Amino acid sequence: MTIEEALLGLLDGQTLISSEMESIMSEIMDGQISPIKIAAFLVLLRQRGEEVEEIYGAARAILNHAEQPILEGDPIDTCGTGGDGANTFNISTAASLIAHACGVKVAKHGNRSISSRCGSADVLEAMGFKIDLPKKETEELFKETGFVFLFAPIFHKAMKNVAPVRKELGLRTIFNMLGPLINPARTQRQIIGVYSKDLTGMFAQVLRQFDAKHCLILHGQTDEGGILDEPSVCGPTYISELQHGTVRTYTVHPEDFGLRRHSISQLKGGDARENAQIIWQILDKNGPEAREDAVVFTAGMACYVAELTPSIKEGIDKARQAIHSGAAKQSVERLLEKHRNLVI
């Protein structure tokens, strides 16, 4: 299928099958399609609404163009689509560090800030991590520590061919959905936060086509009417759980896990330096209850999808114990010591 045929089909409201979408996205990644046609394609997809087969095909194409690090041990990722407008601190990044302290292997995929003041790369860099490690050094570090950050521009170099169009458009497009689906390590266990309740089931169907093992795709809401691409300690969380090919959808509340309900204002973040300080406060056991609850909620889910614990509740308890025993801070300090000694 040519880009011209795809555009005409989209104008008629047609859905691209996954192979057609994969072909078009591959041409985009290869720099073979003009910026104006890329823009038209993205806008028409957005206007009609992206479908499961299209998201799957696009993700396949991008992964096929990515540099894939070989990371053994079935690592997990905690990642969100962004776009919730909540401006919280980096909850999923903090949770990934605490889950690692619990014994979970982590391949955290991320980038600098796009829709918020501080992206996962920004806050980790502010904490002292080297974020832009090449493939070889990433693989070696993972063997030693079981925790790595996969900086998107390093592993997805072909994305540079669409970056100017995305920036100039200034609209949410299919690429805003794809970030959590294109971890270059091809993680099979994930916590994915999405900006729309409708996306939880769609993402589960996409991940099932990728033969993912155990994933929680979730959308949080607040009692004040806001939304979160995180599990919510401020209201309900809608979850589509994919486990060994089966999807079930349900709703949970903080109280289901012994957590208090908090105001979203208590989770607000700032720039990279401020968010790094917030994470250190949590690790030092000086974080306000709301912040600690938000982090252990996600970390507990990470323990659950990694099958380190048989339930989310037990994962939450394990994550909180890691903080209160000092094990989480010690784990992060050991990681930072490794990063300080890296020679690239």
Curated annotation (Swiss-Prot):
A GO-annotated cellular component: cytosol
Superkingdom of source: Bacteria
Cofactor(s) it depends on: Mg(2+)
EC number: 2.4.2.18
Binding site for anthranilate 1: G80, N111
Signal peptide stretch: none
Binding site for Mg(2+) 1: S92, E230
Organism annotation: Chloroherpeton thalassium (strain ATCC 35110 / GB-78)
Swiss-Prot/TrEMBL catalytic activity: N-(5-phospho-beta-D-ribosyl)anthranilate + diphosphate = 5-phospho-alpha-D-ribose 1-diphosphate + anthranilate
Positions annotated to bind Mg(2+) 2: D229, E230
Name by which UniProt lists this protein: Anthranilate phosphoribosyltransferase
Binding site for 5-phospho-alpha-D-ribose 1-diphosphate: 80, 83-84, 88, 90-93, 108-116, 120
Assembly notes: Homodimer.
Keywords noted in UniProt: Amino-acid biosynthesis, Aromatic amino acid biosynthesis, Glycosyltransferase, Magnesium, Metal-binding, Transferase, Tryptophan biosynthesis
Binding site for anthranilate 2: R166
Family per similarity comment: Belongs to the anthranilate phosphoribosyltransferase family.
Pathway assignment: Amino-acid biosynthesis; L-tryptophan biosynthesis; L-tryptophan from chorismate: step 2/5
Cofactor binding notes: Binds 2 magnesium ions per monomer.
EC top class named in words: transferase
Annotated Pfam families: Glycos_trans_3N (PF02885), Glycos_transf_3 (PF00591)
GO MF annotations, alphabetized: anthranilate phosphoribosyltransferase activity; magnesium ion binding
NCBIfam families: trpD
Cited function: Catalyzes the transfer of the phosphoribosyl group of 5-phosphorylribose-1-pyrophosphate (PRPP) to anthranilate to yield N-(5'-phosphoribosyl)-anthranilate (PRA).
GO biological process, one term: L-tryptophan biosynthetic process
